[in-house]
């Protein structure tokens, strides 16, 4: 009985310190990456380790960091049009989108719709693992609040565009632009930006270099949304360029 109690005390002692250590690393990451380029994300680490564990040693999770000044404004506009049109005005969470998604998911349990903002996706991609769980979602909420508190909207968008997954081993808009269009991210056209944004829901299934009918349809929808938002003027009006 005493040995069991000692074992539980040992687990509690070290478990508590592990949690404190992880939280401290997250807080440090939020502060550091408010200014410095992000060298890698947790999703990149997860993909790389997954490849190695399956014996694929040729896989390389590749990303090339570029500042917002070297990213086409069409790309920033495209991801907002596709993923989070209220990004400039919300505080990390789109309550209306959450309520709409909950109502949709109750009616269509086989077709789950998400409501994650760009801020939430940035927090998840940077600090957390992939997949769906209430634990991960709870951690995501806290990290999103921290990011919104410390980072500017422009910084959130910059980090998002540099760590988003656009294909197998392709992370960040610079790597995606060079891989799919043989050009830097600064030269992306509206159509090319919309195509990259169209694969974001599932970049391992949807291909920018071999777009399905669904991807092309989504690309055209994103282009219409970009125009309705006001084009590049929307970026400038919200100090995101």
UniProtKB/Swiss-Prot annotation:
Species, as recorded: Yersinia enterocolitica serotype O:8 / biotype 1B (strain NCTC 13174 / 8081)
First-tier enzyme category under EC: transferase
One GO-annotated biological process of the protein: peptidoglycan biosynthetic process
Membrane topology: Single-pass membrane protein
Function of the molecule: Peptidoglycan polymerase that catalyzes glycan chain elongation from lipid-linked precursors.
Catalytic reaction list: [GlcNAc-(1->4)-Mur2Ac(oyl-L-Ala-gamma-D-Glu-L-Lys-D-Ala-D-Ala)](n)-di-trans,octa-cis-undecaprenyl diphosphate + beta-D-GlcNAc-(1->4)-Mur2Ac(oyl-L-Ala-gamma-D-Glu-L-Lys-D-Ala-D-Ala)-di-trans,octa-cis-undecaprenyl diphosphate = [GlcNAc-(1->4)-Mur2Ac(oyl-L-Ala-gamma-D-Glu-L-Lys-D-Ala-D-Ala)](n+1)-di-trans,octa-cis-undecaprenyl diphosphate + di-trans,octa-cis-undecaprenyl diphosphate + H(+)
The entry's keywords: Cell inner membrane, Cell membrane, Cell shape, Cell wall biogenesis/degradation, Glycosyltransferase, Membrane, Peptidoglycan synthesis, Transferase, Transmembrane, Transmembrane helix
Location in the cell: Cell inner membrane
Protein name as it appears in the record: Biosynthetic peptidoglycan transglycosylase
HAMAP family named in the record: PGT_MtgA
Associated pathway: Cell wall biogenesis; peptidoglycan biosynthesis
